[in-house]
């Protein structure tokens, strides 16, 4: 590939990735539909909302096998299939007439489709820009976050004008077209050349080799903690506002806006910063900010100011962590196997999405969950300040052994 074609291909891949990520991020408007689906099915909102828990779990599971899918079929085909399945999932959701069908369509199918496209396109795009990994991650994952914001207005308008069932059908058609079009612009990133230094050739870690390193599991704990804290606080922010900060319903609803802004800010600020300083130090900065937020929720007298500041801190760290982590994992274990190596760590997103709710259900109230998250953040901070990159797997070049 000529230099000019290489540049053209990678920028087209970036554009396709941004379009695809924007469409995939639309699933985070799900809370808009809980009330209408509850009324349609005659089921409690809590049971309807369980669909989103299944969606998050399915997203994490399919993300973990994205690397295998890319190896076999290529990024373009897998992304197209992701878009088609996502559109089908929304179409089936429109025609769901019981909870089980809703859980299978909106939960399992939509989650698996979304996850297959999300991590695959992200890791492929990052590999096209090895010199700007943090910035490219920020663009891609920032687009995913903006998708939830953009489709909030689209879906709200559709709900008001065409009703619940047609909204899901139109929504599915829009994301299908966007993702399939985005996929046509993408190409698989070329395999990265191994680095040579002082007569030594560094090799990428395979998934099996990575999982034998303690650093891999240290990173996994940090990622799980950030996801658990962010997803739990995002999920119950309005309830915390009313129960603990004693805000009225209208003021409490502003938590959604605060979280969206803080989440996006974390993605952009920490993502860009990760190209300037050591990425693990960026993670440490995010953890300190999240600790301040959790400490405020636990120990500070909560009013509107302290509450919004606290949840903003947690959301900022969550957004920044999921942006920086793909590049961080590639820094520790190499770029060529990034989709596989990060895919298993990304299971922490699905596990974290349900852990907070399970703890709250078992022990009741918010505070026990807050204390668990606070403890995990302290542990994660200790890990991020002590972790060191694994010894590079190296092979001496022929001339170096003579």
Regions found by a protein language model. Name each.
Residues 172-197, 380-388:
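C-terminal membrane-cytosol helix-exit motif in multi-pass small-molecule transporters
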Residues 37, 115-129, 136-137, 320-333:
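Intracellular juxtamembrane helix-capping segments at the cytosolic ends
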Residues 77-91, 281-296:
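Structural signature of the two symmetry-related core transmembrane helices
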Residues 30-34, 208-268:
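Extracytoplasmic gate region of multi-pass secondary transporters
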């Amino acid at each position: 590939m000529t230099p000019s074609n290489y540049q053209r291909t990678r920028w087209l891949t970036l554009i396709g990735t941004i379009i695809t990520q924007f469409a995939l991020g639309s699933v985070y408007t799900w809370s808009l539909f809980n009330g209408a689906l509850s009324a349609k099915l005659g089921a409690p909102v809590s049971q309807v909302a369980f669909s989103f828990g299944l969606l998050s779990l399915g997203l994490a599971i399919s993300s973990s096998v994205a690397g295998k899918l890319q190896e076999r079929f290529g990024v373009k085909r897998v992304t197209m299939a992701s878009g088609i399945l996502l559109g089908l999932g929304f179409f089936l959701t429109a025609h769901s007439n019981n909870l089980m069908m809703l859980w299978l369509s909106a939960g399992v199918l939509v989650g698996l489709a979304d996850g297959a496209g999300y991590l695959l396109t992200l890791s492929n795009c990052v590999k096209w820009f090895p010199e700007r990994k943090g910035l490219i991650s920020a663009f891609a994952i920032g687009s995913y976050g903006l998708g939830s914001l953009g489709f909030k207005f689209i879906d709200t308008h559709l709900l008001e004008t065409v009703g619940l069932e047609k909204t899901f059908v139109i929504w599915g058609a829009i994301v299908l077209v966007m993702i399939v079009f985005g996929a046509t612009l993408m190409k698989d990133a070329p395999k990265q050349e191994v680095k040579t230094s002082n007569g030594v050739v560094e090799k990428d870690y395979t998934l099996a080799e990575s999982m034998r390193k303690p650093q891999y599991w240290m990173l996994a704990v940090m990622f799980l903690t950030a996801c658990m804290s962010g997803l739990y606080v995002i999920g119950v922010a309005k309830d915390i506002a009313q129960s603990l900060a004693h805000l009225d319903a209208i003021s409490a609803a502003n938590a959604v806006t605060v979280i969206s802004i803080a989440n996006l800010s974390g993605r952009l600020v920490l993502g860009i910063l990760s190209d300037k300083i050591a990425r693990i130090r960026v993670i440490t900065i995010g953890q300190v900010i999240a600790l301040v937020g959790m400490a405020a929720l636990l120990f500070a007298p909560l009013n509107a100011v302290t509450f919004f500041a606290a949840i903003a801190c947690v959301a900022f760290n969550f957004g920044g962590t999921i942006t920086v982590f793909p590049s961080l994992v590639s820094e520790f274990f190499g770029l060529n196997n990034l989709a596989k190596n990060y895919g298993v760590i990304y299971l922490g997103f699905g596990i974290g999405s349900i852990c907070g709710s399970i703890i709250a259900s078992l022990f009741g109230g918010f505070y026990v969950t807050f204390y668990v998250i606070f403890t995990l953040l302290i542990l994660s901070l200790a890990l991020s300040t002590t972790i060191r990159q694994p010894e590079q797997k190296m092979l001496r070049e022929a001339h170096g052994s003579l």
